[in-house]
Design a protein with these regions (language model features):
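Terminal amphipathic alpha-helical/low-complexity segments used for targeting or macromolecular assembly
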Residues: 29-107
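Structural signal for interior beta-strand "rungs" in well-ordered beta-sheet cores
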Residues: 1-32
């Protein structure tokens, strides 16, 4: 089994074999993390600055080139300490990293 985070969007017929972070979009026959559900966040009434912070955190964690994934997650915890939604994503990721399924990462 895997977990699907809050407000995540999974494309129809997408195979998901890892945990999907909150606010993510996954598409493809073999599901791949494509980005954030920005439109869904805006439609849900989240402030533009909150959506922007989530996007910056996503880019830092999943698209960053420095360090390894786990180190970027730890650094993001400090960089985005004032944003509860980013902290929710980081909690989800850290829980997944301890589990058997792991978290889906962007390619």
């Amino acid at each position: 089994f895997c977990r699907i985070g809050r407000k995540a969007m999974i494309g129809g017929l997408s195979g998901v074999d890892r945990d999907v972070i909150p606010f993510a979009i996954v598409t493809g026959e073999r599901g791949k993390l494509r980005g954030l559900n920005v439109i869904g966040l805006k439609r849900s009434g989240y402030a533009p600055e909150v959506v922007k912070a989530i996007s910056r955190a996503f880019m830092y964690i999943f698209k960053g080139k420095e360090d390894n994934f786990e180190t970027r997650v730890q650094k993001a915890r400090k960089l985005f300490k004032d944003n509860d939604m980013v902290q929710e994503q980081l909690d989800f990721i850290e829980f997944s990293l301890k589990g058997r399924r792991n978290v889906m990462v962007a390619e």
